[in-house]
């Protein structure tokens, strides 16, 4: 490729504080192992007036997952080495237990444990300890799809990996990371700090320019799925290590970033803690990270030996910034989608009865729709009267049915339009035997509210909103991890006499949790 258009790239970077508003951040571009751009702005702590620098450490959150998998490959070998240990760990399973490779590739079908903490009554700013993580993970008996058939993001996969690695080696993950990864990569200040409450070198902020920025409170203990704190310079060193070892057939990053498939042979979007993407015909590998008050993203294009890194101490869209930086470095112009006028027949709520997942669509203007299906809303371009797509999802409408496809997830669902009014007779207490947790629904002044209760406590009351007959939505916008699970979908079941017998509770991260009415 031709040389990077440095003025264009610099112009984008210097506009980041205006386009991604928040207290501070740090970004870098690396090509051929050399630093093209290294920039920090704003403040690491607004109250202390402590400036952000390339040496400022921040939590890299889920970017840690690739490093957990790197330790696995470097210290133990192929994932199959730990399959028997995983069978002992998930000893409550009757059948359909995932393999360790499924964990590495987010194909396990296990429900995300941070999402399940909500159902177990956790407070967003509560304390979450290692024994509580194992308590939750080791009680699991089912998956929400057959392992190896689909992709679903699951932090618990990597928490379990960390436990298995420590058990197998007899050493802490912190020591293994320091010795086998950080030292060879010259990541001089990178460190595993599992307890988020202990990190105080930089402050992460909730909020925005409308509500203001407030210091985020985090008191969770995580391991394997996240927990590494690193500076921009540490992350630059990682990219340089990747470039130095690119010709090594057994190089760590080459092994981490190798293509993966589903059980049916279809290409998978994820492997060994890395997300696979494409831009302008170029393959990218990388990962994002999030915790309340923090966002980060790294991308690497092996074909052109280019990497981009974005780290924010606020909840800005680091993934968007990192991809746009990559496109600028690659000389890829912004896409100009052709949009059609929205047909009102799109708008409303649509249910897939098999998974209990609900798709909600509303007009966003300018030939776009706002869709709610996964962890957060996504904007969809309407490309024809009955077709719409985003970077993740394709929709094809046929009357009162929408065919939803998420190719990367190997997921194809028939979504049926919800018509009619919801009955109000859902109040009561419901029990999940697998989670040993309750859902309490009450009616106050004609409005329905719900709360979760379990071994982690009793949650606040959340309002429910009707989506259609016997289908309700319960939004949860703050949880222990970030982003939050979003809308929980509640699909109620009735007997032949019309009495409520139970409810299926789920979201994209944790589908199909069955509750019976008490």
UniProtKB/Swiss-Prot annotation:
Coiled-coil stretches:
none
Give the source's domain of life in one word. Bacteria
Q: Where is the active site?
A: 62 (nucleophile), 65 (proton donor/acceptor)
Q: Which UniProt keywords apply?
A: Aminopeptidase, Hydrolase, Protease
- InterPro entries to which the protein is assigned, alphabetical: Bact_CellWall_Synth/Modif, Beta-lactam-related, Beta-lactam/transpept-like, D_amino_pept/lipop_sf, DAP, DAP_B_dom
Q: Give the span(s) annotated as Disordered.
A: 373-392
Task: Please state what the protein is called.
Answer: D-aminopeptidase
Q: What is the protein's species of origin? A: Brucella melitensis biotype 1 (strain ATCC 23456 / CCUG 17765 / NCTC 10094 / 16M)
